[in-house]
Amino acid sequence: MRLTVKQITWLKVCLHLAGFLPLLWLFWAINHGGLSADPVKDIQHFTGRTALKFLLATLLVSPLARYAKQPLLIRTRRLLGLWCFVWATLHLTSYALLELGIHNLALLGSELISRPYLTLGIISWLVLLALTLTSTQFAQRKLGKRWQTLHNVVYLVAILAPIHYLWSVKILSPQPVIYAALALALLALRYRKFRQWWR
């Protein structure tokens, strides 16, 4: 049975809640001692992982819609992508304001260049920014065929973001490896699309 427009609307409401509720939890954790002895790192990792979760969810939509024969699921993709950008921006902001500090923002540029994992992170964020700014129907009409070409760059983020995560942790743990494996699996589902590009 195919999902109806009404069901998709309710699904969007649930996805908005999924994007917003972690923010409420983070505020609660900050104010009620729910973080570790290094709260700055906790905030950075939490915001980064949440952004990565929404990135993976965004990449899951197309194959899920195709294999489950639920074409209306595509309507949730933009919403998931926007939440991915929101959390990626919170991740970047937490580093700039909490790690460097508001009085040391001038160091941000040199930090991004001198630390390769930060370079990958800012490239990913800039791509997400471009995709967010062009996610409207107006931008899609304006760009025409170039719109799809631009939005295919999300696959670059699917490669860079997990590497950024793997590179940023001092002690390798299963979690970043799992995220990287999931991203690789979602890219592998598109092998036919990639093969067509290389022909």
From Swiss-Prot:
Its cofactor is FMN; heme b. It is a multi-pass membrane protein. One of its GO terms (cellular component) is plasma membrane. The chain crosses the membrane at residues 10-30, 82-102, 116-136, 153-173. Binds 1 FMN per subunit. The keyword Transferase does not apply. One of its GO terms (molecular function) is FMN binding. It is found in: Cell inner membrane. GO terms for biological process: protein repair. Keywords: Cell inner membrane, Cell membrane, Electron transport, Flavoprotein, FMN, Heme, Iron, Membrane, Metal-binding, Transmembrane, Transmembrane helix, Transport. Belongs to the MsrQ family. Heterodimer of a catalytic subunit (MsrP) and a heme-binding subunit (MsrQ). Part of the MsrPQ system that repairs oxidized periplasmic proteins containing methionine sulfoxide residues (Met-O), using respiratory chain electrons. Thus protects these proteins from oxidative-stress damage caused by reactive species of oxygen and chlorine generated by the host defense mechanisms. MsrPQ is essential for the maintenance of envelope integrity under bleach stress, rescuing a wide series of structurally unrelated periplasmic proteins from methionine oxidation, including the primary periplasmic chaperone SurA and the lipoprotein Pal. This is Protein-methionine-sulfoxide reductase heme-binding subunit MsrQ. It comes from Salmonella newport (strain SL254). The lineage of its organism: Bacteria, Pseudomonadati, Pseudomonadota, Gammaproteobacteria, Enterobacterales. The gene is msrQ.
